[in-house]
C-alpha cells in the first residue's frame, strides 16, 4: 500500500487569493464574499466603529468594522495595523451610498502579509506634499500614490491603443539594436560604451534600422523602446533616456501619408482615453481634448512670420525654439480652439541628412514636427530612398560614407519611397495630463543628475 502524500503546511501569506480589485466591487454584489489585497491607506477609529481604507492599483476600498458586531480578534489585528502594511481582507460586500462607488466591505478576516515602519519617507495619501527630489529619491513609495498609479495606467492604455491601431493598419512590431557602432544623427550627443575591444554607442534612435527593415521588404514597422541622448539639459521637458514610439512606412506618396496616419491614430486613441478614464481624469484634474481632423499645418517660414508679428524675431530658416512653440500654440488655440498643429517644410540645414528635400525648393525638406499644447511631441519626415542622393546629403553634413556603409549599401537595391516618425511617449503623457515636469510621466527618470533608483 502506497504511503499517503504529505499535505504541505499552509503558508499564511497564501491563505487568501484576490477575487477582485477595488474598482470591480459594485452595489450589485451585495452579500457576496470577496477578497481584496493591497496596502493600508489609512485607519480611522471612532467610539463605535472603525474604518480601514485599503489601496490597490485600481483605487481605494472602504472596509467598515462596527465594534459591537466585529470579532475581538479582528479588532485586535486592526489595532496592530499601520499605514502601508501589506494586507489581505476577506469580507462581504455591502451597499453604502456614502462610500466610494456606493459600496463597502464588512471584513471577517484580515491577514497581515507584511509590515512597514511607522515613519515613512513620503505620505502616499498626498495630504503632506514632498518636493520632487525627495519623491524621486523614494520613487518606489512615490509610485504608490493614486496620482502616479493613474498616470501609468493611462499611459499603458495609450501605448496599447496606439499599438493596436498600427497592428490593424498592417504594421509589424520590431526590436532594433540599442548598442550601435555609429551615431544616427551625427554629432556628439552620444553615450559611449566599451563593447569588448571596440567602441560603441547607445542608440539615439532606431531610425537606420527602421529604414533598413523597409528596404528588407517589411513594408510597415513600429517599435516602442528606449532611446538615449547625452544632452546636458536639466529642464522640466528633457530626459536622457526616454521611450520613443516609432513607426516607418513604405510605398508612400509623400510625408502627408505619415502625418495623416498619425493624426487619425491620435484622434482614435484620445477618444478612447477620454471615454475610458473620465473618472480618473477628473481625479487628476486633467482634461483631454480630442483633436479635430485634419490637424492644422503651418510651414516653418510662415510660423517665423507669425512669431515676428508677436514680437519674437527669429533668423530666416531657423528652428522654432520652445518659446516659439508655446506662442504658436496660444495663437492656434485662440483662433481655432485646437491644441495640436504640425510644423512643416523645415529647412534642410536643421534636419537630418536622410530627410527628403523638397523638389521645388531644395533648401526646404519634407520634414515635420507635431506640437501638442505648446511642446513638440513628434518629429518625422519622408526619407530619402535613392542611394546617390542619400550619399550626397550625408557628405554635405561632413560625415563619411564609409562609416555608414552598413546603412547606405542596401539603398542600392531598389529601396521603396518611405517615411516615418517618432513620438516621445513621456512628452505625450505629460501634455495629455497637464504635468509641469516630464519626470512625472516616467517610472524611473534618467536625467542630467539622476542614475538611481
Give the ranges of each region predicted by the language model:
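Secondary-structure capping and boundary motifs in well-ordered enzyme cores
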Residues: 79, 183, 198-204, 213-216, ...
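Short Lys/Arg-rich cationic patches that frequently serve as NLS/NoLS or arginine-rich RNA/DNA-binding motifs
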Residues: 1-6
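Hydrophobic alpha-helical scaffolding
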Residues: 29, 148, 152, 177, ...
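Metal-assisted phosphate- and nucleotidyl-transfer catalytic regions
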Residues: 184-185, 189, 264-370, 396-409, ...
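TRNA-recognition modules of translation machinery and tRNA-sensing kinases, especially anticodon-binding
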Residues: 216, 220-223, 239, 243-254, ...
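Class II aminoacyl-tRNA synthetase-like tRNA-binding/catalytic domains
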Residues: 11-250
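His/Asp/Glu-rich mid-to-C-terminal helical/loop segments that flank catalytic regions of hydrolases
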Residues: 245, 251-274
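A generic secondary-structure signal for well-formed alpha-helical elements
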Residues: 44, 89, 95-97, 114, ...
Amino acid at each position: 500500500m502506497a504511503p499517503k502524500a504529505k499535505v504541505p503546511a499552509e503558508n499564511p501569506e497564501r491563505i487568501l487569493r484576490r477575487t477582485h480589485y477595488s474598482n470591480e466591487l459594485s452595489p450589485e454584489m451585495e452579500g457576496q464574499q470577496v477578497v481584496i489585497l493591497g496596502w493600508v491607506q489609512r485607519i480611522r477609529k471612532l467610539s463605535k466603529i472603525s474604518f480601514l481604507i485599503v489601496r490597490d492599483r485600481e483605487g481605494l476600498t472602504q472596509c467598515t468594522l462596527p465594534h459591537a458586531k466585529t470579532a475581538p480578534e479582528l479588532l485586535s489585528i486592526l489595532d496592530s495595523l499601520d499605514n502601508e502594511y501589506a494586507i489581505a481582507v476577506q469580507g462581504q460586500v455591502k451597499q453604502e451610498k456614502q462610500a466610494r462607488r456606493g459600496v463597502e466591505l464588512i471584513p471577517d478576516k484580515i491577514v497581515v502579509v507584511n509590515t512597514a515602519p511607522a515613519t515613512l519617507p513620503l505620505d502616499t495619501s498626498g495630504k503632506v506634499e514632498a518636493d520632487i527630489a525627495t519623491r524621486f529619491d523614494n520613487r518606489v513609495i512615490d509610485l504608490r500614490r493614486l496620482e502616479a498609479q493613474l498616470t501609468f495606467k493611462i499611459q499603458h492604455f495609450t501605448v496599447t491603443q496606439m499599438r493596436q491601431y498600427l497592428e490593424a493598419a498592417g504594421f509589424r512590431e520590431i526590436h532594433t539594436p540599442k548598442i550601435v557602432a555609429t551615431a544616427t544623427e551625427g554629432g556628439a550627443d552620444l553615450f559611449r560604451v566599451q563593447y569588448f575591444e571596440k567602441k560603441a554607442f547607445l542608440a539615439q534612435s532606431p531610425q537606420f534600422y527602421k529604414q533598413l527593415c523597409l528596404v528588407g521588404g517589411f513594408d510597415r514597422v513600429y517599435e516602442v523602446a528606449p532611446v538615449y541622448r547625452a544632452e546636458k539639459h536639466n529642464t522640466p521637458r528633457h530626459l536622457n533616456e526616454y521611450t520613443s514610439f516609432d513607426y516607418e512606412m513604405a510605398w508612400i506618396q509623400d510625408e502627408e501619408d505619415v502625418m495623416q496616419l498619425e493624426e487619425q491614430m491620435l484622434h482614435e486613441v484620445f477618444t478612447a482615453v477620454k471615454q475610458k478614464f473620465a473618472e480618473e481624469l477628473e481625479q487628476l484634474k486633467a482634461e483631454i481634448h480630442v483633436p479635430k481632423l485634419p490637424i492644422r499645418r503651418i510651414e516653418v517660414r510662415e510660423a517665423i512670420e507669425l512669431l515676428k508679428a508677436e514680437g519674437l524675431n527669429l533668423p530666416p530658416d531657423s528652428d522654432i525654439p520652445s518659446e516659439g512653440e508655446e506662442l504658436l500654440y496660444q495663437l492656434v488655440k485662440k483662433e481655432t480652439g485646437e491644441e495640436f498643429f504640425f510644423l512643416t517644410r523645415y529647412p534642410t540645414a536643421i534636419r537630418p541628412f536622410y530627410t527628403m528635400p523638397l523638389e521645388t525648393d531644395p533648401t526646404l525638406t519634407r520634414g515635420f514636427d507635431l506640437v501638442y499644447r505648446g511642446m513638440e511631441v513628434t518629429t518625422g519626415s519622408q526619407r530619402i530612398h535613392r542611394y546617390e542622393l542619400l550619399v550626397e546629403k550625408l557628405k554635405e553634413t561632413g560625415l563619411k560614407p564609409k562609416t555608414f556603409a552598413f546603412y547606405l549599401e542596401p539603398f542600392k537595391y531598389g529601396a521603396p519611397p518611405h517615411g516615418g516618425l517618432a513620438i516621445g511617449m513621456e512628452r505625450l503623457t505629460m501634455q495629455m495630463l497637464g504635468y509641469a515636469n516630464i519626470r512625472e510621466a516616467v517610472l524611473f527618470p534618467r536625467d542630467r543628475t539622476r542614475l538611481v533608483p
